[in-house]
């Protein structure tokens, strides 16, 4: 017993493992008990009846795509790392040391998954970001945090609770033939007040999903949108799935993750990168593998689609001295600041629509309805003709122009404003230079005469 403690102490001093433990049974991360293995096996087998089709033969798909994206990860990271060293040492300092083989092995056992080799290669380069020394620099991916594997494990468990809850509800509704119960399930982020996220404590309470059901109405409940995927059929039409593994997060419930269980014969690939979360009723396919996604991010950096937003230390808006600020996506040429999730979403839609035009095939009614829905729900942030700052300033100006009913002497205020403007014009055009004291005295005397 004593020798075991001694060996454990020596292990803690000498190992480079961060996730893995000397005694796996005592690990805080050990969540994969025999019961949970059966649970996730049930998820994989029961997905067919709950989300519209049988699952893939995972083993054959894994063998086919196991090396996809590995070279791309190495190439993209070389460009990203060089960019960080040149432009953002603060962001570079948030990157953690690599994961060990033991870390990645235990991580996959805990979640009962096999990671794509390109993602394993990436975590052998860096274990995501740490916020202990971020200096206000924020997330690496244009403000989005690249999570270490321990945070990935915790967030995946939360999303699996979401999927388990929804599957049990849908299964109960199907077994009892009470389809009216489906209309009581909130499926949109806009209607759900019970889905809560925070950076320190991710709580998913009474989460929701719908699976290929038409819109339903119920007393006291508005029409609830279906969950859809872009392109259609590439991702399961569900709010959550136990085999969606979040990798990058905005820390308010939206994620960029990998899909380890795409629909059969739907055009998706094992290990594809998708966009999902509480604000996305539509799920978006943004890359075939994680290596391709990193190349997209690296290309945006190389193209100059970036800027740094000044960081604030506290509510008094004191600037952090020496801080680079948060990396944000700024469209080159227009100088528009756009959330990166919206950028990826827009590109996915444009690529899909372009493929439809190239095929010249007749669009089905479902495709036409989906295109119409996408056009009607396009985020207003993509329609700004000016920068984000200009948009905010215009709204502030319109607010300032509204009359305040509390003020009684509006005419006096307007008159005082006109007098002040006249004084400024006189001061600007006068050939005689006056000091600040004489200008103030002149302004006061003029105001007294008006009164």
Curated annotation (Swiss-Prot):
Residues 410-451 are annotated as: Disordered. SUPFAM superfamilies: SMI1/KNR4-like. Residues 428-438 have a biased composition (Basic and acidic residues). GO terms for cellular component: cellular bud neck; incipient cellular bud site; mating projection tip. Gene3D superfamilies: SMI1/KNR4-like (3.40.1580.10). It comes from the Eukaryota. GO terms for biological process: fungal-type cell wall beta-glucan biosynthetic process; regulation of fungal-type cell wall biogenesis; regulation of mitotic cell cycle. Residues 410-422, 439-451 have a biased composition (Polar residues). It holds the Pfam family SMI1_KNR4. PANTHER family: CELL WALL ASSEMBLY REGULATOR SMI1 (PTHR47432:SF1). Belongs to the KNR4/SMI1 family. This is KNR4/SMI1 homolog 1. The lineage of its organism: Eukaryota, Fungi, Dikarya, Ascomycota, Saccharomycotina.
């Amino acid at each position: 017993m004593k020798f075991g403690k001694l060996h454990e102490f020596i292990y803690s001093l000498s190992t480079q493992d961060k996730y893995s433990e000397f005694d796996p049974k005592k690990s805080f991360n050990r969540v994969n008990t025999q019961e949970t293995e059966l649970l996730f096996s049930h998820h994989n087998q029961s997905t067919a009846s709950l989300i519209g089709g049988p699952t893939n033969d995972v083993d054959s798909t894994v063998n086919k795509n196991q090396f996809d994206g590995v070279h791309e990860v190495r190439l993209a990271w070389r460009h990203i790392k060089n960019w960080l060293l040149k432009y953002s040492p603060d962001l570079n300092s948030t990157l953690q040391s690599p994961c060990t083989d033991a870390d990645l092995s235990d991580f996959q056992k805990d979640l009962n998954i096999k990671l794509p080799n390109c993602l394993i290669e990436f975590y052998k380069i860096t274990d995501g970001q740490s916020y202990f020394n971020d200096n206000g620099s924020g997330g690496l991916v244009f403000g989005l945090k690249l999570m270490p594997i321990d945070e990935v494990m915790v967030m995946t468990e939360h999303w699996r609770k979401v999927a388990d809850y929804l599957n049990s509800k849908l299964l109960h509704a199907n077994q009892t033939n009470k389809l009216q119960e489906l209309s009581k399930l909130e499926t949109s982020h806009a209607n759900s007040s019970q889905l809560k996220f925070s950076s320190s404590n991710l709580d998913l309470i009474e989460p929701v999903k719908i699976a290929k059901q038409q819109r339903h109405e119920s007393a006291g409940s508005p029409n609830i949108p279906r969950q859809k995927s872009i392109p259609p059929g590439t991702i399961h039409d569900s709010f959550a799935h136990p085999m969606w593994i979040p990798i990058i997060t905005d820390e308010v419930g939206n994620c960029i993750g990998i899909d380890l269980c795409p629909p059969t014969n739907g055009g998706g690939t094992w290990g594809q990168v998708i966009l999902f979360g509480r604000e996305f009723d539509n799920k978006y396919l943004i890359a075939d593998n994680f290596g391709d996604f990193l190349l997209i991010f690296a290309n945006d950096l190389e193209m100059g689609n970036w800027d740094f937003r000044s960081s604030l230390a506290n509510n008094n808006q004191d600037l952090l001295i020496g801080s680079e600020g948060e990396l944000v996506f700024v469209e080159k040429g227009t100088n528009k600041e756009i959330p990166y999730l919206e950028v990826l979403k827009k590109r996915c839609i444009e690529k899909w629509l372009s493929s439809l035009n190239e095929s010249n095939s007749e669009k089905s009614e479902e495709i036409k309805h989906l295109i119409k829905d996408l056009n009607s729900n396009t985020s207003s942030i993509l329609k700004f003709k000016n920068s984000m700052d200009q948009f905010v300033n215009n709204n502030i100006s319109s607010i300032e122009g509204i009359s305040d009913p509390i003020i009684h002497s509006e005419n006096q205020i307007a008159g005082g404003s006109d007098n002040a403007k006249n004084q400024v014009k006189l001061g600007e055009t006068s050939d005689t230079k006056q000091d600040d004291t004489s200008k103030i005295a002149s302004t006061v005397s003029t105001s007294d005469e008006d009164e």
